[in-house]
Amino acid sequence: MAKKTESTGCDTCHWSGFVITDSASYARAELCSCIEECPHCEGSGNILSENENGYSYVAPCHSCGVIRRNVKLYNIAGIPAKYSHVLQVDAGLELKRMNSSLQRALKYAKDEFVKKYPTKDGFLLMGPSGLGKTHLAVGTISELTLKHGVKCLFKDFF
């Protein structure tokens, strides 16, 4: 059964409209069945609209179009499968176990970069292994793609 407009989702997807799985190499977002059955666009993600001058145009479905676009953006970001559980910047990170530099990076990523995007140009995380840099990067990418519709690409240089 499909939900409408702002209340898109169900208990299966925790009202997000998508579920995350891990394929062989990459995390993968898939539309929840509550979205696939959208009554507004019949699953296409688009509706026919008309502007104030009477011209018809194709627009994203107000009920599921944004979710469909954001799922595609998440899937092309190339997030490693082992991070499929990380859907927000601070997911699973414990402040008390982090050094002060990583705490500042987390605060910057969450409070400055994600919330104020695109006014910030980006950031680079450097340091020894095991600090949580990849976790922080994946969380940032997940939030930007799934919640804000921003095109991102995960790149591991090593």
Where are these regions (language model features)?
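Pre-Walker A (pre-P-loop) alpha-helix and adjacent loop at the N terminus of AAA/AAA+ ATPase modules
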Residues: 92-123
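A short, basic N-terminal segment
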Residues: 1-103
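Short, surface-exposed linear patches
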Residues: 84-86, 113, 147-148
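Generic structural signal for beta-strand residues in well-ordered domains
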Residues: 54, 116-118, 145
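A short hydrophobic beta-strand->loop->alpha-helix junction that borders the nucleotide-binding pocket
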Residues: 154-158
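Post-Walker A helix-loop "phosphate-sensing" segment adjacent to the P-loop in P-loop NTPases
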Residues: 142-153
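Walker A/P-loop nucleotide-binding motif
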Residues: 119-137
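Hydrophobic, well-ordered secondary-structure segments
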Residues: 102, 106, 134-141
